[in-house]
A protein has these predicted regions:
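Stable alpha-helical elements in mature extracytoplasmic
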Residues: 38-42, 46, 66, 70-73
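Regular secondary-structure segments
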Residues: 47-51
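Bacterial N-terminal signal peptides
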Residues: 13-23
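Compositionally biased, low-complexity segments enriched in small residues
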Residues: 24-27, 39
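Aromatic- and glycine-rich peptidoglycan recognition patches
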Residues: 2-7, 11, 26-27, 31-34, ...
Length: 166
């Protein structure tokens, strides 16, 4: 057996250790758990924007206001028609559109439903567990439904929460 001279560096164990670490790494990110509904897909797209800055009127992909994040997430999921993306540009217009069609409720939210605060002054996406994702002044964040300063108004049921991903 050949030994290395004193002070020589051996790179083989380091290379092997690196190979072991890479082989143990998951092939898909843990955050990309199985997505089975359009609502989950919409939430995942919104979560990819976490930390992006707030900018009034911005619709992404690098900055958002509250309705911009909603429109961007729905469009990227292929569901822009669900919120009439383009014709409904503000949180208030989205809220009024769905309210006039009887699609709002203060109970039983589903993942991917919209959350409205202050009668349309702010809007976000329900992610489950009493939490929502929305763009506040400090950027795209996850927060409790009742933690936003504007008063919680309603949930908007867009029908994406149960629509299966094909």
């Amino acid at each position: 057996m050949r030994t290395l001279p004193l002070g020589a560096r051996a790179f083989i164990p380091v290379a092997l250790a690196g190979a072991v670490l890479f082989s143990l790494a998951p092939s898909t990110p843990a955050a990309a758990a199985t997505i089975t509904t359009e609502g989950q897909q919409i939430v995942q797209i919104a979560k990819w924007q976490l930390g992006d800055p707030w900018r009034y009127g911005a619709t992404g992909p690098y900055a958002f206001d509250c309705s911009g994040l909603v429109i961007y997430s729905y469009k990227r999921a292929g569901e822009g028609a669900a919120i009439r993306a383009g014709s409904l540009r503000s949180a208030r217009s989205i809220y009024l559109y769905f309210r006039s069609r009887g699609k709002t409720s203060r109970t039983n939210p589903k993942v991917g439903d919209l959350v409205v605060w202050g009668y349309g002054s702010h809007i976000g996406i329900y992610i489950g567990g009493g939490k929502a994702i929305s763009t506040l002044r400090n950027g795209v964040r996850i927060h409790g439904v009742f933690a936003v300063t504007a008063r919680f108004t309603t949930y908007i049921h867009t029908g994406m929460s149960t629509k299966r991903v094909s």
